[in-house]
């Protein structure tokens, strides 16, 4: 049986619509900290890993390196992220500054509110299944 070509059956469209919805939800909650969800994700990953090369962070984020560099610029300009040449001089090591650590601390409760808001929309169990399914797809890709 042939798959219908109706736009609302497109997996990519549905995924992008969901991503936009979630981004708006998280951005709204993180706005008091002056962060977008993408910026928060970068800061949170740097806090967890302490130091990453741009290529490592891009791989974790599943982003093009050039897109990540553009995303890092405002974080560097705000003084939250520091980029220094690695010992071999061929790559950049990215770390959080002290003010970046403070910014993550300020944003975590706002992020938790966004998590709770999404769980309120779809139910906690469904939200967890949704996250786990997406994570599984990302790891398989």
Task: Annotate the PLM regions.
Residues 36-42, 100, 115:
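The N-cap/first-turn positions of alpha helices
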Residues 49-53:
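Short capping segments at the starts of secondary-structure elements
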Residues 54-55, 66, 73, 92:
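Residues within helix-turn-helix
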Residues 1-33, 96, 125, 132, ...:
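N-terminal leader segment of winged-helix/HTH proteins
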Residues 73-132:
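Charged, amphipathic alpha-helical coiled-coil/dimerization segments
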Residues 21, 25, 41-44, 102:
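Pre-recognition alpha-helix immediately N-terminal to the DNA-recognition helix
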Residues 58:
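The alpha-helix within a helix-turn-helix
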